[in-house]
Amino acid sequence: MIVIDAGHGGEDGGAVAADGTVESGINLAIAQDLDALLRFLGCETRMTRTEDAAIYSDGARTLREKKASDLKNRVALVNAQEGAILVSVHQNCLPSAPSVHGAQAFYNGIEGAD
């Protein structure tokens, strides 16, 4: 199982480019394309979100609570899939250092670690 996480969403748009482009929309488009490609190749996938919405719990009121709840729910979704691989899509922005750019890849090499 490959869990595809389109980072941010809903009220949490993530980084915003100089032209006003919001990260969460780009993340979702990339995640949907990746999902389609992996399914075409015969992989079993699950997406954390399929629309511009966060997945926070009903009790979350403030933006801080919503972000914390959203992250907690994403982790729970991944952990519920035994042996899952997580691909979390993000676009980072560092306006103070425009030379900093490119892909980042993080992975957990410890089996069973949270």
Go through the PLM ranges and name each one.
Residues 1-20:
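Short glycine-rich His-centered loop
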Residues 21-114:
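Active-site-proximal helix/loop segments of hydrolytic enzymes
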